Amino acid sequence: MLLSGKSLKHDFIRFVSATMASQVVFSLYSMVDGLMVSIGVNEYAMSAVNLAIPFTNALFSIAVLFAVGSSTLITIFIAQEKRREANALFSQNFATLLTLGAVITALVLLFLEPFAYLLGADEITLDYVKQYILGIAPFSVCYLVSYNLEVLVKTDGYPRYALFTVIGGCLTNCVLDYIAIFHLDMGVFGAAVATGISQLVTCISYFVHFFSKKCTFRLCKFRFDPHLYARILPIGLSDGVTELCTGLMIFLFNRTVLKCIGTDGVVTYTVIAYVTTIVINLMVGISQGSQPLASYHYGKEDHTGCQKLLRYALTTVCIFAPALFLLVFFFAPQIVRTYLSHAGDELIAYSIGAFRRYSVSYLLLGFNIVIGGFMTAIERPVPAICISVGRGLALQSAVLLLLAAIFGGDAVWYTPIFSEALCLVMSLLFLRSYRRQTDMQA
């Protein structure tokens, strides 16, 4: 693992800043698709892209599951100078993702229309959803491999290389989106293909690194060892569940809003979901950027270093959380009008109010994500999974359904505020338990 040798704080800033930037750029993939589809087609096509997001979230969650678990274990192996084991794990994980991607592509294309209905498509959005899935599904392997290699490049000590690769992929997506939608008139299908090709471009860039001499670990012949996943999957489960829960909550929110408010409510939530994805990914960037460092110091049994990294991460959240909330609160009208340029004044006004209420949750969610990610880095999967499932699905879905049933449709916009607050209580309890155990070992 390539460290600067200057200070722990310097390494933290170097890793986290690059990871946060790459996470923001990665979230722009769906935002660019949605924005260009809204302008180039219509707002219902944009809603269809939002309906398809749970599918891409599912792909991303699988990628995160294997990437975080394997990178954590590889980092520990490297800290323990077990280079051969690190190479074998890297190679096995890569082969597994190729197989999973091929299977997912085949199943989705075989059951395309039922899958579109499962995502929440109706008579208005069915064709749009099918077109988007048809364009993105063949690139499932690229989705899985791309993020896995990105995390491993950062684990190898080259976060800037990963950042520039992600930026290059995003720029490719923007250019191809524009060409496909506005020049080739390919609509939603063109937006999906553009996104898939950009993922392929990032994969190729990462391969250049892993076949270079500067790479610490590389592909090699290996004997498949299923027992490795007994360690990989529990470690990566927390972050994987965090990503999967994002997709599941978008799915559940779409269903609930459609039932309680109607189609305009889904359009409103689509705008909120795009911006919230950026906020969440920024916090995930803080978490995942510090994880390789925390795992490295944990492997060396440096508990003081681990606690410093946690303090740095939480301090970063304290800076970014209120800044993001204020930014969204005051610029909500401009953001909403950008996406709903063809909508009526009533829908725009309603969306601005809903957006501002929802954005209060931005003050809390980062703390839960960082604490859960830290538990992952130090091989405490049970607290990490509890936090991830709690904030991402269990508490949020329960609060959503309860508020909708008691107070009606408009109350759903308060859902994340209450669910994140409840989860924060649980996170702080787990954190207190960890600190007590660490103090006893000192």
Predicted features, each with a name:
Residues M1-T19, I74-V141, H183-L237, A294-S361, ...:
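Short alpha-helical transmembrane segments in multi-pass integral membrane proteins
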Residues L3-V41, P54-G69, L73, L98-T105, ...:
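N-terminal transmembrane alpha-helices
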Residues R14-D33, G135, S146, G169, ...:
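Transmembrane helical elements of multi-pass membrane transporters/channels
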Residues L28-S47, A116-E123, I179-M186, G247-I278, ...:
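Helix-terminus/linker motif at the lipid-water interface of multi-pass membrane proteins
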Residues E43-P54, V129, I133, A192, ...:
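Small-residue hotspots at the loop-to-helix junctions and early N-terminal turns
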Residues M46-A106, Y143-A162, T268-A332, L365-I387:
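Small-residue-rich hydrophobic transmembrane alpha-helices
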Residues A58-S61, T105, N173-D177, C203-F207, ...:
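Hydrophobic transmembrane alpha-helices of multi-pass small-molecule transporters
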Residues I136-K154, A162-C170, A191-Y206, V284-S287, ...:
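Short runs within selected transmembrane alpha-helices of multi-pass transporters and secretion channels
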